[in-house]
């Protein structure tokens, strides 16, 4: 590529909110949990895994070894609901063997965390409504408790559950009257007042 690493942030800022770190990740040289800065070759231990978007690390040997198959899967959606393929079946066979408990045999695959949270909420709403109807309760059961300082995405339902450091990002979006509670956490420095809370 002809773009110089030191020009990347300025180039991106022309079209996106480029308020991320100054480090420019070298996708070829980064490895394991180490990010290599494309600008100067410095290495940084990744302690935040791109907010869980990069939890496997960088250039995992098994993934690199199988990049031809992964490339094929990247350009063709494999988890189609109406027509199937060998890669989907192979994955689901392994998934069922190692990750599916006997009491949760059904799977539903979705593209991304926000949409997964949305579908979990819809499942919970449906379940609660059915429980209430079976008990003769007319209420919908559509209330949710969530934590302060949480991030669950910026799609419909998840927007209410997400706290943002910049309220301008969501101030005109409709939200639900759900219940926000403080998340359990330890604050530093630890003193006698903090220890009383533990």
Language model features with spans:
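Glycine-rich loop-to-alpha-helix module at the N-terminal edge of alpha/beta enzyme cores
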Residues: 2-5, 14-17, 24, 43-134
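Short loop/turn motifs at secondary-structure junctions and domain boundaries
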Residues: 22-31
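Short, functionally important structural connectors and interaction interfaces within domains
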Residues: 4, 17-19, 48, 143, ...
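PLP-dependent aspartate aminotransferase-fold enzymes
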Residues: 93-198
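Short, acidic, Ser/Thr-enriched surface-loop or helix-capping motifs
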Residues: 37-39
């Amino acid at each position: 590529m002809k773009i110089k690493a030191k020009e990347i942030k300025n180039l991106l800022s022309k079209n996106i909110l480029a308020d991320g770190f100054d480090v420019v990740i070298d996708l070829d040289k980064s490895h394991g949990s180490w990010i290599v800065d494309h600008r100067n070759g410095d290495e940084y231990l990744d302690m935040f895994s791109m907010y869980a978007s990069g939890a496997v690390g960088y250039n995992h040997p098994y993934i690199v070894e199988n990049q031809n198959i992964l490339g094929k899967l990247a350009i063709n959606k494999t988890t189609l609901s109406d027509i199937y393929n060998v890669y989907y079946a192979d994955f689901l066979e392994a998934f069922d063997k190692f990750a599916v408990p006997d009491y949760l045999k059904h799977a539903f695959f979705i593209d991304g965390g926000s949409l997964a949270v949305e579908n979990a909420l819809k499942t919970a709403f449906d379940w609660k409504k059915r429980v209430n109807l079976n008990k003769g309760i007319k209420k919908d059961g559509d209330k949710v408790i969530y934590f302060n300082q949480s991030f669950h995405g910026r799609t419909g339902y998840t927007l209410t559950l997400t706290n943002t450091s910049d309220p301008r990002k969501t101030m005109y979006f409709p939200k639900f009257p759900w219940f926000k509670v403080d998340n359990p956490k330890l604050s530093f420095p630890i003193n006698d007042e903090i220890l009383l809370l533990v």
